[in-house]
């Protein structure tokens, strides 16, 4: 397949086609991915997001990779839903260090009715700070999805994790079809989709291909596709899994870029385990989004300063959003924080 042949957006990928991409010589695959990438993006710009865990631990799901699952003893303390004000303060800090998108994650099977007002207030508050908003709250009803859209949520993250064939080996408390249904609700409500998967759970190359096929063959490609490397946490069933070969990880990023040419492909969890050379290869393969800051939910993430140093060495700059002038934007931040302190939803969000 020529480097330009896969620039067009497609939704009809077959396993044989995707397998052929994975089997290309490494240099040919990276050349094709970089060519596709340059057709749609500035190759020297990377979108920067910050992720905050707004509710940690005791999740009823049994995802074998996750330290937040209540099924496993990982030493992670259960925490209540964060106060709205604290979330906004964290968002303001993220803005100050260069993030353009603020992602909020809660360890839930699905959000409860009592928590939804606070979640919606978080979305509205973060939007006032001039950041794009993203949330991952588990499975959603159609009504909850619409409420989030009405509050101004830009992105909803709901990963497929792996192929349909391998999925049952990793999760039994939520079906693949339920995940796809949530994505359908998100799209129907007019929000953007963030959905990807995890490498290193014992899956085959065909499973990696199957995951990408599920994502690329959706009616519309996800705007953001996070590709995670398993972070092995003691106490989870996958703690002793074999490490992913770095070249296999880069291959998956490259194939994702070719199959979903207009999507942001995010270098997500597991980045702390990657040296600078591997991260540089990831950007060459078409990754153009990262999580930035001190923590990625409950696992470590490279320090923000190191990220900017690497960007400088590679000649990469963060993507920018159109926004207010600095003075106006700072005033907007301060006003949003004042309004939030005065809100009746400010105190003890978990006890409502």
From Swiss-Prot:
Sites binding [4Fe-4S] cluster sit at 59, 63, 66
User: Which GO biological-process labels does this protein carry?
Assistant: biotin biosynthetic process
Q: Where does [2Fe-2S] cluster bind?
A: 103, 134, 194, 266
- Where does the record place a coiled coil? none
Q: Name one GO molecular function term.
A: 4 iron, 4 sulfur cluster binding
Q: In which pathway does it act?
A: Cofactor biosynthesis; biotin biosynthesis; biotin from 7,8-diaminononanoate: step 2/2
Q: How is the cofactor bound?
A: Binds 1 [4Fe-4S] cluster. The cluster is coordinated with 3 cysteines and an exchangeable S-adenosyl-L-methionine.
Q: Which domain of life is it from?
A: Bacteria
Under Enzyme Commission nomenclature, its number is 2.8.1.6
Q: What class of enzyme is it?
A: transferase
Boundaries of every Radical SAM core domain copy? 44-262
Which InterPro entries does this entry report, sorted A to Z? Aldolase_TIM, BATS_dom, Biotin_synth/BioAB, Biotin_synthase, Elp3/MiaA/NifB-like_rSAM, rSAM
Q: Which reaction does it catalyse?
A: (4R,5S)-dethiobiotin + (sulfur carrier)-SH + 2 reduced [2Fe-2S]-[ferredoxin] + 2 S-adenosyl-L-methionine = (sulfur carrier)-H + biotin + 2 5'-deoxyadenosine + 2 L-methionine + 2 oxidized [2Fe-2S]-[ferredoxin]
Query: Which keywords are on file for this protein?
Result: 2Fe-2S, 4Fe-4S, Biotin biosynthesis, Iron, Iron-sulfur, Metal-binding, S-adenosyl-L-methionine, Transferase
Q: Work out whether the entry's keyword set contains Metal-binding.
A: yes
SUPFAM superfamilies reported for this sequence: Radical SAM enzymes
Name what cofactor the protein needs.
[4Fe-4S] cluster; [2Fe-2S] cluster
Q: What does this protein do?
A: Catalyzes the conversion of dethiobiotin (DTB) to biotin by the insertion of a sulfur atom into dethiobiotin via a radical-based mechanism.
What family is this protein classified in? Belongs to the radical SAM superfamily. Biotin synthase family.
- How is this protein organized at the quaternary level? Homodimer.
This one is known as: Biotin synthase
């Amino acid at each position: 397949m020529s480097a330009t042949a896969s620039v067009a957006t497609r939704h009809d990928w077959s396993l044989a086609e995707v397998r052929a991409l994975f089997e290309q010589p490494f240099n040919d695959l990276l050349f094709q991915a970089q060519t596709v990438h340059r057709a749609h993006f500035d190759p020297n710009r990377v979108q920067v997001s910050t992720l905050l865990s707004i509710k940690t631990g005791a999740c009823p799901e049994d995802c074998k990779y996750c330290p937040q699952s209540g099924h496993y003893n990982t030493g992670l303390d259960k925490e209540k839903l964060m106060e709205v004000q604290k979330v906004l303060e964290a968002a303001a800090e993220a803005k100050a260090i260069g993030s353009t998108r603020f992602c909020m994650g809660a360890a839930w099977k699905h959000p409860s009715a009592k928590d939804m007002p606070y979640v919606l207030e978080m979305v509205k508050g973060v939007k006032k700070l001039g950041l794009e908003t993203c949330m991952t709250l588990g499975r959603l009803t159609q009504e909850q999805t619409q409420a989030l859209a009405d509050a101004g949520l830009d992105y909803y993250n709901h990963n497929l994790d792996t192929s349909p064939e391998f999925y049952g080996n990793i999760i039994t408390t939520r079906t693949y079809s339920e995940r796809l249904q949530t994505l359908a609700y998100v799209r129907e409500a007019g929000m953007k989709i963030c959905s990807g998967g995890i490498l290193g759970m014992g899956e085959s190359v065909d499973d990696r291909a199957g995951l990408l096929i599920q994502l690329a063959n959706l009616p519309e490609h996800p705007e953001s596709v996070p590709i995670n490397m398993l972070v092995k946490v003691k106490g989870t069933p996958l703690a002793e899994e074999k490490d992913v070969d770095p070249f296999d990880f880069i291959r998956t990023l490259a194939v994702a870029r070719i199959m979903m040419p207009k999507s942001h492909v995010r270098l997500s969890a597991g980045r702390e385990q990657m040296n600078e050379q591997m991260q540089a290869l990831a950007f060459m393969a078409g990754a153009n989004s990262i999580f930035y800051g001190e923590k990625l939910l409950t696992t470590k993430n490279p320090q923000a300063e190191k990220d900017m140093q690497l960007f400088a060495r590679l000649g990469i700059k963060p993507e920018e959003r159109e926004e207010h002038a600095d003075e106006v934007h700072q005033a907007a931040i301060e006003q949003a924080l004042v309004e939030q302190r005065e809100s009746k939803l400010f105190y003890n969000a978990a006890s409502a």
